[in-house]
A protein has these predicted regions:
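Beta-strand-dominated extracellular/periplasmic modules and repeats
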Residues: 2-300, 322
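Intrinsic-disorder-associated, low-complexity terminal segments enriched in Asp/Asn/His/Tyr and depleted
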Residues: 307-308
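Cationic, low-complexity basic patches in intrinsically disordered or flexible, solvent-exposed regions
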Residues: 313-316
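Nucleic acid-binding interface residues in structured DNA/RNA-binding domains
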Residues: 325
Length: 325
């Protein structure tokens, strides 16, 4: 069956049969995706057995709550980031730290404080080094931003996330912290480690078929928002991890890598309220936020009219220094 016949068949089955109100966008997407799927079936000569096995696979992946993991592992999330980067470039928006994937393990509703937060529940205290994250939220002109919300989440020493790992307390290693009047925040937490896909899971099943591993480097996730600005989704990854530039989710990007140095100065140890030497990351990340979606058309018009010079007024940079113990 050629594409013309495929399109006619889809029109007959999914457009002409409508008897009630139609959501035009949903119809457009379904018709296009079905057309491409049917064409792939023709091009690859997929058998009915292969098609039904595929449907069974997606059923299993959904029941295992791994569809989000699969999206990351096959590069869908990274593609969406690159597409967003391209859109920003076309609009003349540049600077700041790169965005990168959210991943499938965010949970809304983490405890929220102002200025300082402790992220861990103490269950791994003394078993894993402590991490102190000091951050500052600014605009691109260096103005401090009060009231920015910084959401942070990461894995424990076993590479597991609370809620998905039922052995952890709710919201362990998940917190939201609001910046103070001077744009500052501090998070006291534990050193994250990387993780691998469940070895018997549906995502690893596909990766095995592709000859790929399913490992991620150690990393910390962020959402950064401020009133009137678009949310930024990003993360930093840890230098020295064997999977740093071989992340199965393709999340590592230039500008998002933290390098640790040892700190043995007793005064600094005391200032941090610690009892022994630790490591620190001399790292500054500029997280760029853009005006909310509802204002994007206005921003683009302004950019075109003013040669992008005024667009910088609508940008927000987020700077953070990360200290490890």
């Amino acid at each position: 069956m050629n594409r013309q016949n495929i399109d006619a068949l889809i029109q007959k089955m999914n457009v002409d049969t409508a008897t009630g109100p139609v959501d035009a966008r949903t119809q457009q997407i379904v018709v296009r995706l079905l057309g491409d799927l049917f064409q792939a079936i023709e091009d690859l000569d997929l058998s009915q057995t292969e098609i039904w096995k595929g449907l069974e696979y997606f059923t299993d992946a959904g029941q295992a709550n791994e569809l989000g993991l699969l999206a990351a592992g096959l590069g869908l999330e990274h593609y969406l980031d690159l597409r967003a980067d391209e859109a920003d470039a076309k609009a003349g928006i540049s600077g700041g730290t790169p965005r990168t994937i959210e991943g499938p393990l965010y949970v809304a509703g983490a405890p929220e404080t102002v200025g300082f937060t402790r992220m861990d529940d103490g269950s791994e205290e003394g078993k894993i080094p402590t991490l102190i994250i000091d951050g500052t939220v600014k605009d691109t002109e260096g103005n401090l931003i009060e009231g920015a919300k910084v959401e942070i989440w990461h894995a424990n020493s076993l590479g597991n996330y609370s809620f998905f790992d039922k052995s952890q307390s709710d919201f362990n290693l998940r917190r939201s912290v609001i910046t103070t009047a001077d744009g500052q925040y501090t998070a006291l937490t534990t050193m994250p480690v990387g993780y691998g896909c469940p070895p018997q899971g549906t995502t690893q099943f596909v990766l095995d078929k592709l000859g790929r591993h399913g490992n991620r480097p150690s990393h910390v996730h962020y959402f950064v928002t401020a009133p009137g600005f678009r949310k930024l989704t990003t993360q930093f990854n840890i230098e020295g991890d064997q999977y740093l530039w071989d992340d199965f989710a393709f999340a590592t990007r230039d500008g998002l890598v933290a390098t640790a140095v040892d700190v043995t100065d007793e005064a600094e140890i005391e200032r941090r309220g610690l009892t022994g030497a630790f490591s620190t990351f001399n790292l500054t990340l500029n997280w760029l936020l853009i005006k909310m979606v509802r204002r994007q058309l206005t921003l683009i018009v302004v950019a075109l009219a003013l040669n992008y010079s005024e667009v910088q007024r609508f940008q927000l940079a987020f700077c953070t220094e990360i200290s490890w113990v």
